[in-house]
Amino acid sequence: MDIMQTAVAGSLESSDIMITVNPATDGITIDLESSVEKQFGRRIRQVIEETLKHLGVNGVLVQAVDKGALDCTIQARTIAAVHRAAGLDQYNWKEIDSWNV
């Protein structure tokens, strides 16, 4: 999936995460800001990266501002931001459910 434009999903409310995706030339770069980064930073990055790989995204800069989001919220916000950035409004729920993340 190609990132065509900058897109955002989520909020800065407690227990949420704001994911901003930007087009990049190659690779996946994740810039994380979180009050729990020392404890959960590695896991937050892992969930974002795995979700991007499942979606077939390469060439993206992700800015994530975490406010204590659970893994399922991180995944959902990443999926929404990527679909918006790619200009897609249809989700393949069967495929997403098959990830077992």
Swiss-Prot record:
Ranges in coiled-coil conformation: none
Modified residues (O-(phosphoribosyl dephospho-coenzyme A)serine): 14
InterPro entries for the chain: CitD, Mal_deCO2ase/Cit_lyase_ACP
Domain of life: Bacteria
Alphabetized UniProt keyword annotations: Cytoplasm, Phosphoprotein
Record localization: Cytoplasm
Disulfide bonds: none
GO CC list: cytoplasm
Assembly notes: Oligomer with a subunit composition of (alpha,beta,gamma)6.
HAMAP family per UniProt: CitD (MF_00805)
Family named by the database record: Belongs to the CitD family.
Summary of the function given for this chain in its UniProt record: Covalent carrier of the coenzyme of citrate lyase.
The protein, known as: Citrate lyase acyl carrier protein
